[in-house]
Amino acid sequence: MHLNKIRGKNMKKSHILGIIICIILIVGFFISFDSTFLDNPKMMSKSKNNIRNAENLTNISKNSNNLKFLWAYQLQNADIDEIANSNFTLIVIDYSKDGTENGKYSEEEIEKLKKAGKIPIAYISIGEAEDYRFYWDNEWLKNPPKWLGDENPEWEGCYAVKYWHPEWKKIIFSYLDKIIQQGFCGVYLDKVDEFEYWAENGYDEDFTAKEMIKFIVEISNYCRNKTNNSFIIIPQNGERLLEYDKHGKLLNTVSGWAVEDLFYDGVEQKTEEEINERIKLLDKVKDSGKFVLVVDYVDDGTKTNENLKRVEDFINKSLDKGYVPYVAKSDRELDELNTWWLKLIN
């Protein structure tokens, strides 16, 4: 691993230092990924002091050796101090507290996370345009660019994009410039599964899948050329892309993979058929020596035994597969750092 393109005279020393810190954190992260993270009793005793009390907890230690690190996923109102003092190692947050340019985190705030030993990863949607982002032009509602598609009926203000168009790629690269400048150590790529949407709306899936693979590789090259070769790339969902990755270029490019709703759809269990169809692809990632992150929205926020058992079941199933779980609230808002469930892992 080495620094690339940091020779520019105008690059601030603090930015160069931030890149170096990212490299150190990421190298340490992958070293710990090859060890048993939860074997450290001090870490676990610390976590128990930071989470709420719960009664009748079932010990999940039979699978805890499969857990190499902890990760968290919060896209709204993230508190930098709270995250810095948490036991999560890999942190996925938005580049902005509220999604807008005015709310973006400062370089100093991201630096604070890194100094606390956290690896900050920036969320970015590459398959949809969001009307609250810095790049949005309200004129598009009257005169949409040729790459802008329909609004997502489940997420107001989010619009499908033909991500293979140069105009959209230019927007994403400018977005990545902001993320890199802030000092993030990687990106979390959402809506990579948009290739399936366009395959259902007039395009051949072989084309849409290969164009998404190409885009992810381009994003990786862009970020790593501007920072370092260890810059983390994590796609979310869309693991069927691996079926089109005939020469392994995508798998060689990504640092790991993340999925939502693997074992549960909200608080409802998925069928074995649904689960196994995804696991056979996710295991390709795991078997290549890379991590698999899983976030299921299983926590309904109550202290009932039903909720507890569901959360335990999700954790156990994830650990049994060698995946890294994060228990999220069932409202899917991702507006808080959910920590109480960590007490189940001891």
From Swiss-Prot:
It comes from the Archaea. Gene3D superfamilies: Aldolase class I. Its main location: membrane. One of its GO terms (cellular component) is membrane. It holds the Pfam family Glyco_hydro_114. This is Uncharacterized protein MJ1477. Keywords: Membrane, Transmembrane, Transmembrane helix. The keyword Coiled coil does not apply. It is a single-pass membrane protein. It comes from Methanocaldococcus jannaschii (strain ATCC 43067 / DSM 2661 / JAL-1 / JCM 10045 / NBRC 100440). It is found in: Membrane. The chain crosses the membrane at residues 16-36.
